[in-house]
Amino acid sequence: MDMREQKFGIEIELTGLTRKRAAEVIGKYLGQEPHYDGGYYEEYSVRDEQGRKWKVMYDSSIVAVKKGGDSAGDEYKVEFVSPICEYADIPTIQELVRQLRHAGAIAGENAGIHVHVNAAPYTARTLRNITNIMYCKEDLIYKALQVDVEREHRYCKKVEESFLQELNQKKPKSIEEVSNIWYRGRDGRNRHYHESRYHCLNLHSVFQKGTIEFRLFNSTTHAGKIKTYIQLCLAISAQALNQSSASPVSYTHLRAHETRH
């Protein structure tokens, strides 16, 4: 599969402006009026010409501040959520981020970006592939991206070696079997806030909503970086889907070597 054939979505945690203002900015760029949908997440939405919803939502984990740095109320906790996108939508995402930045949006303390890639093409084998690939690459990726230490330990933990080992020993044949290993025999797929989601490679998202979620990125309003983050996730996913297998043996070796140095 060409990485550009995959569908994806992105969630960007921001502050510096209110959700209402963010929705107005998105609506102006898309040429549509924002709609306040309300609910627990105090959601605003803007439909594009294709009828897709671009959302602005409340996220309790965001540290709310005004652009000048003064503390702010909950209305400044802004999560920008795209609809299901195709590769050709990346420039639109970039321009929306630019417009939000011009309106005062900033990447707050400990804020993150989550990229979701469509998991429909995945099998048990390719889920094992992507787990092994991430185990291999995540140390280098974390260093290159300068992932915030607090976020790493709290919201985007690295692949658990116990999960990796059991996955490779059992070589599950079905996604249901992968799910049993992920949840350690306890079915948590129907719980949106299951604690297992706080991993760089979040497979809870596969079982709960049908997407591979990458959670490691620090938030930013730099449109070029956001494009790179999306491309990185699509490339890793395409590698997992395209190669016949991925072994963790050399990866364990690499991680041990880096720890010693």
Could you describe each region identified by the protein language model?
Residues 55-58, 128-218:
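Aromatic/basic-lined ligand-recognition segments
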Residues 106-122, 211-215:
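Histidine-centered divalent-metal-coordination microenvironment in nucleic-acid enzymes
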Residues 116-123, 153-160, 254:
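Short, conserved secondary-structure transition motifs
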Residues 197-200, 208-245:
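Beta-strand-rich recognition/accessory modules
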Residues 29-34, 100-107, 137-139, 234-244:
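A common structural junction motif
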Residues 1-102:
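Terminal catalytic/cofactor-binding subdomain
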Residues 28, 89-96, 120-145, 221-237:
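Helical (often loop-to-helix) elements that flank the catalytic cores of nucleotide-handling enzymes
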Residues 252-261:
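Conserved small/polar residues in nucleotide/adenosyl-binding loops
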